[in-house]
């Protein structure tokens, strides 16, 4: 009689047991690979919190809560100018290193983090990591964003919106009411109230999507209006971009208020190695909405706060602008030294969108802040 072989069906006959086995093996492999990375990583000797050797999760949670800047600042106070933030990212608060990282042509391309913001398979200026493509795109927009072009085509509209916002603030104050300056500056910087809701949803949804993509994917599947608005806001921005394409084609290239996209030089478009497609214009239009609305409102709110918090400065500033001619223009304001200084100092102290600008260490590695970092490290 042949010998009886051991029966091993206890794990194969039960689906529950098989799932448990797979989960257990997967967890063990993840744990061992994480431990191996922590022990062998070239970044292991850098200062930093213990968890930075193993996981990104504490940083991701801080970002989702809108506390990234404060969170990293607190860690700098504890660990110094250079420390390991995650298994693959190093935080640096060093002027010389910052200059090296962000100087033009320095070789530090945008980190992979930016790729998560690409819409419709078309990268815009904000999330474009290819340096040559980015430079070509900037050249296409250079004329439209030149100071003389903006003044000639848009100053009248800016003045109308500024005067309307200031008038509304004055009406509230004369009625003895408090005035929400952030609200009015946001209305001033945004064409339609609908845009504001899209901007708010985009900011929240983009943060979650970039740090916790699985949660964002699940959120899009839940048929709740708030979640749908939050996690599909980019699609709505693309819709606005579509309107920009249509209006730019209809408006032509002349006259005040012509679309930024209508001012693109056709010859430059043809000569460019990376000409703009309709999808590119839709994406850039959405980017411009995000970049120019709440940033303007936030900066003006902090400027107003800072001036009111310093009465002597307020008096000097009021005296300076009182000397402007009745029909003053932007050029006249630019010639006011104190006003210019106040604007610049506000932008220095209260950046409209403070946060990291993650870059990847170039091929061959680099020394930053006294530490050698391997290529591909996010800094």
Place the predicted regions along the sequence by residue.
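Conserved, non-catalytic sequence blocks in retroelement Pol enzymes and Pol-derived host proteins
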Residues: 43-47, 61-66, 148-153, 330-337
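Cytochrome P450 heme-thiolate monooxygenase catalytic core
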Residues: 110-119, 133, 152-300
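N-terminal membrane-proximal hinge/A-helix region immediately C-terminal to the signal-anchor transmembrane segment
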Residues: 2-136, 159-164, 168, 228, ...
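Structural signal for hydrophobic/aromatic residues that build the beta-strand cores
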Residues: 48, 75, 85, 94, ...
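Cytochrome P450 C-terminal heme-thiolate binding region
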Residues: 86-98, 238-250, 323-379
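Leucine-rich repeat
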Residues: 23, 240, 265, 269, ...
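Cytochrome P450 catalytic-core helices
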Residues: 295-320
């Amino acid at each position: 009689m042949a010998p009886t072989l051991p029966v091993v069906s206890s794990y194969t006959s039960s689906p529950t047991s098989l799932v448990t086995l797979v989960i257990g093996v997967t967890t063990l492999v993840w744990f061992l690979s994480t431990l191996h990375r922590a022990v062998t990583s070239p970044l292991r000797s850098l200062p930093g919190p213990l968890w930075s050797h193993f996981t990104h999760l504490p940083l991701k949670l801080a970002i989702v809560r809108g506390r990234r800047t404060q969170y990293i600042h607190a860690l700098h106070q504890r660990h110094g100018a250079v420390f390991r933030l995650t298994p693959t990212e190093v935080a640096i608060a060093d002027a010389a290193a910052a200059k090296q990282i962000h100087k033009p042509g320095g070789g530090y391309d945008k980190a992979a983090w930016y790729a998560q913001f690409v819409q419709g398979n078309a990268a815009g200026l904000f999330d474009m990591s290819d340096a040559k493509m980015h430079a070509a795109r900037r050249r296409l927009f250079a004329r439209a964003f030149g100071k003389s072009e903006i003044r000639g085509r848009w100053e009248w509209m800016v003045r109308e919106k500024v005067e309307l916002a200031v008038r509304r603030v004055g009406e509230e104050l004369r009625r003895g009411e408090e005035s929400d300056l952030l609200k009015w500056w946001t209305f001033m910087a945004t064409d339609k109230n609908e845009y504001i809701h899209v901007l708010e949803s985009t900011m929240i949804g983009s943060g979650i999507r970039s740090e916790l993509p699985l949660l964002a994917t699940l959120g899009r599947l839940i048929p709740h209006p708030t979640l749908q608005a939050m996690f599909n806001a980019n699609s709505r921005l693309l819709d606005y971009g579509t309107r920009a394409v249509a209006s730019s084609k209809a408006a032509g290239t002349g006259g005040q208020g012509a679309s930024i996209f209508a001012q693109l030089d056709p010859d430059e478009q043809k000569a460019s190695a990376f000409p703009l497609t309709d999808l590119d214009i839709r994406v850039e239009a959405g980017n411009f909405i995000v970049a120019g609305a709440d940033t303007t409102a936030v900066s003006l709110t902090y400027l107003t706060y800072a001036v009111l918090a310093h009465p002597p400065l307020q008096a000097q500033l009021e005296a300076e602008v009182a000397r402007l001619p009745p029909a003053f223009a932007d050029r006249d304001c630019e010639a006011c030294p104190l006003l210019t200084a106040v604007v610049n100092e506000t932008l220095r102290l209260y950046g409209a969108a403070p946060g990291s600008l993650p870059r990847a260490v170039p091929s061959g590695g680099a020394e930053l802040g006294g530490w050698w970092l391997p290529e591909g490290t996010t800094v």
